[in-house]
Amino acid sequence: MTEKKTAPSFQFMKDESTSVLGGEWVPMYCTDEPVEFSKGDFETAMLNVIREPNINSTAILRADILAEKFYDLEGNEQELSTDDKPVLSESLPYDADAKLVNIDDITTRKELIENKELELTIVKEFVRRMIPRNPYKDALINQTCLVYNSKKTENKDTSLVLYIPHFEDEADCPFYIPHVQKVAILLHGGILSVHYIPYAGQSEDLRKDNERVVRTAFRLLQTAYKHSKGVMQGYEKRVNHDQVVDRVLFQDTYIQLKKKYSKFLVDNWAESTDPKKHVFEDLAIAAFLLEFWKTQYGDDYKTTMQFRDMGCGNGVLTYILISEGVNGVGIDARKRKSWSIYPTEIQRHLKEQVIIPSILLRPTPDVRRYMPYLEDNGAMFPIKVEDGLIAPATLVYSSADLIASPNVNICEFPDNTFIIGNHSDELTCWIPLLGFPFMVIPCCSHDLSGKKVRFNTRVPKSEKTTPAMKNNIKINSNNVNNSNSTYAGLVNHVEYLAKKVGWKVEKEMLRIPSTRNAAIIGTDNAYAKEFPTPDIYRTIEEEGGALTWVQNTMQLAKASPRNH
């Protein structure tokens, strides 16, 4: 039995006065033994880190690649593949209040490596713009990233990655990058190491392992090692974001929304829950929706569509969307304290109503065909009442009563309505069955009667597919995960229901501070004008019916609000 190889330790090189790179370079950390991954693994990992600098710092939102060139060892420029060509954002995520440092300088900065024994030459060069999460606190900067290889055969496995920020003044160095002039990560002789060129008078600090800049060097080495080994082992991302909405567009909109609304919402939070979690989550969802609607309905979407936020809870999402000029309504069975903090015009768009889909109250299409004058199905719904009575009693509501009640929303909306289900609990499985384009972010598992239930993940068998499912061909295969967890089962079940009644489903793993971040989206259904279709009635029946939905949703109106 072979022993499992342990990872090398990282050695602080404080007693070494000179770097293998020569010149002003100061060695910081290195592995104490040769690494097991190859130069190719290292460069693949580091190219990903160049494009995704948020891997190294949570204060960084992303990097925009402004320039990119590849060369052979003789210095001849190589043609970039389509995937490698940089795509610049037309809109920039900042305004007059944002901090900017020399961002007009997009000229690549070169660095000559003085150690002639290495004979290093540039094979890849990038200029990237670093976008911090808060550009009103941390400055945007440009930075050159260089990849060197050796011309010498004996150093064919040597690779160097070098970072040079586009400013000279030490005072301009933002918090989210190492506080030094230049950074190098070197793979040479199987040893992985990190080196700095310090600012004037900084060399002494680089010998103290409790200094932040020294700890940063350790983390840079740790990240380079971890990600290179991951490439070697064939690691693949479990979650792919940005399948539906472009990442840059989403993040730029998120920055703007956060600046406009976060302080007011956090400072005036009226609930007992953590304001930052809810506020920043809903800001991100709003940013996603605004960009999605723009691609779906066009630039004039604010005048051509409207939304209904079903189970809107604290109303934050509704508040942001309406404030951004989108017409819509937030609906919830219970009014929240937070509703009172919003302007009067927003409060008018927040409705305290129980939601009872009209399919439970209206005659079926077959009945209406023979009796078109009928407005309700004549159903009776007994509701037990105990509060304030001498003895428990039962109220009986008719479907006609519920249709006429201003305290009941029966989901009969204008044709241009888009439905949002943001952690809408009992409503989650109902939303794809209402006949309107939708986005639902599942959270807690309930069936169509409103009862808690656990769904198993499943793939519908071909012999059980409905005509609507056969017509549904646009399925995003991005899975939540492969396990049969309660959440994975719920997400899978919502997708199943949506496809079963004809929706062409897309799925996005939203960039929100929540582990329950799967968004199921349906905008195209060949049967939309025929709702409610036979498939919907059949689906409700196959799901066990919804006989107690009315009773459960009435009880929901009396219960205390849940917090997610």
Swiss-Prot record:
Keyword field: Cytoplasm, Methyltransferase, S-adenosyl-L-methionine, Transferase, tRNA processing
GO BP field: tRNA nucleoside ribose methylation
Chemical reaction(s) catalysed: uridine(44) in tRNA(Ser) + S-adenosyl-L-methionine = 2'-O-methyluridine(44) in tRNA(Ser) + S-adenosyl-L-homocysteine + H(+)
Entry's Gene Ontology cellular component terms: cytoplasm
GO MF terms, alphabetically ordered: tRNA(Ser) (uridine(44)-2'-O-)-methyltransferase activity
Record family assignment: Belongs to the TRM44 family.
Name the UniProt record assigns to this protein: tRNA (uracil-O(2)-)-methyltransferase
